[in-house]
């Protein structure tokens, strides 16, 4: 689930030496599976460990992960890096914003995953997002835009030249896209 480099393990062990006995490290994700997901590391006293938590054994301490965060911390890596600028603890969690999907995932799951991992990070630069409403029997992916995309004058270009092309290329079952958003231009609109 989570790999912690030997240098990071030594760093944690050193920090934990100044804490109460049986204090461990908790690794977590706030807002998992969303574009606002943020990972964190904190001290975890023994009395804060829940029955549903997952314990990972490391050199001199346990890593504690709550059940909700666990799938989003799959393949996460924690390292303690020293360079000419100093030292830094890094936590890379490639699945924090969208969990991995299995090879036999439904078309809806695969399309939603593509929107969450490929499209929404780009739209987030403009304060926008898109979600899948449904996929029709004719293979049309019906989408709804929000945030800065609502009312944006460039939405047709984003929809047809960006999202639709990517979806048709990636999913042979998709024949097109449709936007059901009731666009209202305002201060929130990007363009």
Swiss-Prot record:
Binding site for [4Fe-4S] cluster: 149, 152
A Pfam family reported for this protein in Swiss-Prot or TrEMBL: NifU
Keywords recorded for this protein, A-Z: 4Fe-4S, Iron, Iron-sulfur, Metal-binding
Origin superkingdom: Bacteria
Gene3D superfamilies (UniProt xref): Fe-S cluster assembly (FSCA), HesB-like domain
GO BP annotation list: iron-sulfur cluster assembly; protein maturation
InterPro entries: Fe/S_biogenesis_protein_NfuA, FeS_biogenesis, FSCA_dom_sf, HesB-like_dom_sf, NIF_FeS_clus_asmbl_NifU_C
Gene Ontology molecular functions: 4 iron, 4 sulfur cluster binding; iron ion binding
Cofactor note: Binds 1 [4Fe-4S] cluster per subunit. The cluster is presumably bound at the interface of two monomers.
Cofactor needs: [4Fe-4S] cluster
PANTHER family: FE_S BIOGENESIS PROTEIN NFUA (PTHR11178:SF51), IRON-SULFUR CLUSTER SCAFFOLD PROTEIN NFU-RELATED (PTHR11178)
Task performed by this protein: Involved in iron-sulfur cluster biogenesis. Binds a 4Fe-4S cluster, can transfer this cluster to apoproteins, and thereby intervenes in the maturation of Fe/S proteins. Could also act as a scaffold/chaperone for damaged Fe/S proteins.
Assembly information from the UniProt record: Homodimer.
Family membership: Belongs to the NfuA family.
Record's protein name: Fe/S biogenesis protein NfuA
Organism name: Pseudoalteromonas translucida (strain TAC 125)
Record lineage: Bacteria, Pseudomonadati, Pseudomonadota, Gammaproteobacteria, Alteromonadales
Gene: nfuA
